Design a protein with these regions (language model features):
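Short, basic/aromatic-enriched C-terminal tail that caps enzymatic domains
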Residues: 99-115
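Helical "substrate-binding/catalytic lid" subdomain
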Residues: 1-100
Length: 115
């Protein structure tokens, strides 16, 4: 449970923040900051986030299992409840409009463009 929480949780946290930056009109600023301060994360993001799309429907129940695993830690439980909700939303988006998937793809494509 701990490994899944760290590995998948990191991917989901990143996706949530990329979507948030895009909705807030801050995608370009975030891309610039990541490119300058964390260039080593470009390739892992470019791989892990798109790889997550077709698995999101499976990840939601896994995040809920992690919620139970965390036991009496309300703050940690809330984090993974939110990640389960994000998984369900991304799974629905993938078979629906794909607006969020497209937003993530655009962010990642621009992040990995040569500078």
């Amino acid at each position: 449970m701990s490994y899944a929480g760290i590995n998948k949780g990191t991917t989901l946290l990143t996706a949530a923040m990329l979507l948030g930056a895009t909705r807030a009109g801050a995608a370009d600023a975030l891309r610039a900051e990541l490119s300058e301060s964390q260039p080593e994360l470009r390739d892992p993001y470019a791989r892990s986030i798109p790889d997550m799309y077709p698995k999101a429907y499976r990840w939601a129940p896994e995040m809920e299992e992690i919620v139970e695993f965390l036991g009496d830690d309300p703050a940690a439980r809330l984090i993974f409840q939110g990640m389960a909700a994000l998984c369900r939303r991304l799974a629905a988006d993938q078979v629906g409009e794909q607006a969020e998937v497209r937003s993530l793809d655009v962010f990642i494509a621009r992040l990995t463009e040569p500078t």
